[in-house]
């Protein structure tokens, strides 16, 4: 039986943890006030980020989250995004994967949608 992937979602501004495993930023825009040198990232996978029109429409409005989730999952079926999603699956095969976002509410972010997809 295959091991269930250990996927975590955290804010990039939080202190890194030894349990984070591979740390991947999944936002399209680089986080304010953070230098690339102090980000403690494995990589920045902006190919899986929501499109700019979808991100602007959503605007982290909790009332729009379910519709955002539906639209974003549809975007993730596009070839370039699907390939990036598969890359994240590969990263999560053998060690924990922490998806990082700058949003103040990671539980209603693209990182949470990605984590749910990667866990299935």
Where are the language model's segments positioned?
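Residues lining hydrophobic/aromatic ligand-binding pockets adjacent to catalytic sites
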Residues: 1-120
């Amino acid at each position: 039986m295959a091991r269930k992937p250990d996927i975590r979602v955290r804010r990039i501004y939080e202190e890194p943890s030894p349990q984070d495993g591979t740390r991947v930023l999944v936002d399209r825009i680089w986080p304010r006030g953070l230098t690339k040198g102090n980000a403690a990232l494995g990589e920045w996978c902006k190919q899986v980020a929501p499109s700019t029109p979808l991100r602007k429409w959503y605007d982290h409005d909790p009332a729009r989250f379910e519709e955002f989730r539906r639209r974003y999952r549809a975007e993730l079926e596009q070839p370039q995004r699907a390939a990036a999603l598969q890359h994240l699956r590969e990263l999560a095969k053998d060690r924990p994967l922490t998806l990082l976002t700058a949003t103040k509410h990671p539980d209603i972010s693209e990182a949470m949608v990605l984590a749910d997809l990667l866990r299935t």
